[in-house]
Amino acid sequence: AAINVVRNHDKCWKITYAGNWHKELDGLLDDYSFLYGEEPTIAEQKVRAATGRTSTVYVCCNPPIPNNFVFSPPIEGRWISWYVMAYGYDGFLRWAYDAWPEDADRDARHGSWAAGDCYMVYPGGKSCIRFEKMREGIVDFEKVRILRELTAQSGNAQAQGLLKQL
């Protein structure tokens, strides 16, 4: 119903949604961010990509693995970008960046959420291994994206083949 209100008001407005995959919403959304593990099939994602619709993956208070919790293995933050790349998504949505609890330097819990779920950096711009690993994954993603773009322009079939293996 809400989508119809938006479409009836202005057909040019873009509609986005973050949540579990619902096939019935697919054609209605310009930008769909799927919860990791609740995503479309690879074939459905390829159709979204071919029609120019944005698709991203996100994690939040779940799933427990992979994630960016204080107790998560740091490599998970980097691995997520490789997963995003492998499945042809446009990017990764981190649901919270700086929602700090009262004393973030002493206690990373925020309400009932897992420790570290609500922030990736500490007050005052202090980084942490979780953020740095996520950043490394983003850099990896961008490097491969740029290499794919350059090899497509060059027509180098061998290089294109190697990049498809990633």
Please report, for each region that a protein language model flagged, where it lies by residue.
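Catalytic-core regions of glycoside hydrolase
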Residues: 1-103
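Catalytic domains of carbohydrate-active enzymes that cleave complex glycans
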Residues: 1-21, 89, 105-166
